[in-house]
Curated annotation (Swiss-Prot):
Source taxon at top rank: Bacteria
Subunit structure: Homodimer.
One GO location term (cellular component): cytosol
Isomerase among keywords: yes
Name the record gives this protein: Triosephosphate isomerase
Active site residues of this protein: H95 (electrophile), E167 (proton acceptor)
Amino acid sequence: MRHPLVMGNWKLNGSKHMVNDLTAALRNELSSVVGCDVAIAPPVTYLELAKHHLGGSRIALGAQNVDTHLSGAYTGEVSAEMLKDIGAKYIIIGHSERRTYHKESDEFIAEKFAVLKEAELIPVLCIGESEAENEAGQTEAVCARQIDAVLNSLGAKAFENTVIAYEPIWAIGTGKSATPAQAQAVHKFIRDHIAKHDAAIAEQVIIQYGGSVNAANAAELFTQPDIDGALVGGASLKADAFAVIVKAAAEAKQS
């Protein structure tokens, strides 16, 4: 049985004061929650501080990006080994903001995926379509293309102990969200697409939903059979809102 994962992506937000307060509040809010894995991905400059405050808790540490190189003359980059050394476990790659603002290709993201697997870290592979692609009926084709970049280079086995986050671009930070039925249909397509290569791998892969997940819509989303948690943006910056989402995932998957 798949174990749900709710992960907070802090994006370009944070300060030492915020890390101190938010991690303390999260520890308090989530101390009694079982049945759902939890992770947060602060900016890389605050990973060490967050790790210190999360010590002894069930909240895992994540990161928002990784470079394809392990070392060398690559100014400003952070390697998989550095993230592993500092204690990060879940690493976000392929986020639409990276694809859009940094022009990251499917092939480049597949390289990042490979580097993370080699380092025994867990990739959180973000995929999803734009509003125009959605309106043109291309959602499945876009998701398949983004997954195939990894499947074709690394094979289905690479998705063992891996997370996929379906994030429709039109729903990220917009207040819009796919309906539970819409999201479930895409999640099922993703799982079925991987199952064409390896059914057992497809069955165990965690598929999160992302895109304006909040306290109001979380519970209904998580009742869907192929939605295994969430990658949460803005709501992860408030302990009470994030905790509601985590608790909704834990309750939905236990019932």
